[in-house]
């Protein structure tokens, strides 16, 4: 996710030039407000609950729950060390967090935020996802190279699906029996038959490398894979690459708005790339919205079309710091950027 100022400027100018020459207008998205959370710790995926006015934030050893409109704290879920993501099962009134350093999932009550149970999973569960076709909770176990399948009715692991690779990331579903897994170390999409609980295909993403964030348009059957400075658009029926589009550096999250047909990539360099799905086979980069360094993950509130990107402030590096040194996060600077039109 390293990016020099010079390279960032070139990328931004080039994007502006291309948009101007082609007559494309800017997306209109901008940072409308910033929610500040004083507690320490890093961050990963946020989750906007479509069934309530709550925003859930993976934050070090806990999950912060905020009011989506005001940013006010409405709860905290503790003992989720290394938390990566949050998923919801509204029909059962339950939520699930993937706790990477604890190798488990926390089950909590959506209404109260109270913890109901912890479920052991594979090693370092990363993405956690409610799959609507099978009605199961699935975790991608980043260090274990497999998926844990949980029945939310019993809150028990009912299957483990081996996936080749040791860096499995985001999972998406076609809502018809197939799920798609980003394999970061293999630079491919792994296809799983969720009924048979078995891998059926491996689809290479080349020239895309290091895929992390993933989104899907279930209507047009298009997958959107956030790779190293590229968004790869893939046919979800056969793995054919439809398009490849330039995005900012350090993407770790992709969101899709099914109503506006917009794809958003959160880029750790400090931009959000906005791409329009004109049709199933035509895509255009229309904007690179300034955000903040470190804002690499994203979630969307599909009702309001609001986007949420967590980040923090960074301490300046010493002049003699070795190349590749990562800056430290300023303690207590955790925040969420709220982007609207």
Label the model's feature ranges.
Residues 1-27:
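Bacterial Sec-dependent N-terminal signal peptides
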Residues 19-341:
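Predominantly soluble domains enriched in secretory-pathway, periplasmic, or organellar proteins
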């Amino acid at each position: 996710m390293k990016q020099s100022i010079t390279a960032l400027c070139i990328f931004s100018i080039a994007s502006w030039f291309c948009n101007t020459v082609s007559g494309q207008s800017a997306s209109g998205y901008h940072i409308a407000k910033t929610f500040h959370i004083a507690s320490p710790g890093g961050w990963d995926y946020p989750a906007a609950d479509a069934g309530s006015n709550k925003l859930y934030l993976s934050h070090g050893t806990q999950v912060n729950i905020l009011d989506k409109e005001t940013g006010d704290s409405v709860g905290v879920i503790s003992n989720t060390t290394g938390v990566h993501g949050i998923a919801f099962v509204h029909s059962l009134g339950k939520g699930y967090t993937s706790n990477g350093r604890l190798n488990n999932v926390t089950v909590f009550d959506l209404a109260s935020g109270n913890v109901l149970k912890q479920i052991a999973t594979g090693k370092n569960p990363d993405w956690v996802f409610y799959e609507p076709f099978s009605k199961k909770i699935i975790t991608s176990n980043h260090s274990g190279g497999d998926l844990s399948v949980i029945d939310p009715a019993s809150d028990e692991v009912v299957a483990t699906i081996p996936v080749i690779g040791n860096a499995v990331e985001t999972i998406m579903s076609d809502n018809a029996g197939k799920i798609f897994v980003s394999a970061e170390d293999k630079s491919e999409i792994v296809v799983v038959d969720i009924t048979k609980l078995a891998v059926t295909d491996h689809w290479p993403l080349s020239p895309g490398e290091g895929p992390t964030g993933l989104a899907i348009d279930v209507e047009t059957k298009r997958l959107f894979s956030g790779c190293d400075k590229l968004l790869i658009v893939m046919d979800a029926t056969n793995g054919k690459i439809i398009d490849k589009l330039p995005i900012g550096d350090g993407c770790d999250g992709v969101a899709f708005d099914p109503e506006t047909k917009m794809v958003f990539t959160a880029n750790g360099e400090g931009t959000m790339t906005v791409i329009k799905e004109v049709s199933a086979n035509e895509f255009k980069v229309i904007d690179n919205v300034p955000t903040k360094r470190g804002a690499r993950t994203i979630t969307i509130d599909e009702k309001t079309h609001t986007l949420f990107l967590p980040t923090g402030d960074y301490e300046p590096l010493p002049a003699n710091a070795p190349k590749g040194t990562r800056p430290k996060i300023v303690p207590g600077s955790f925040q969420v950027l709220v982007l609207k039109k």
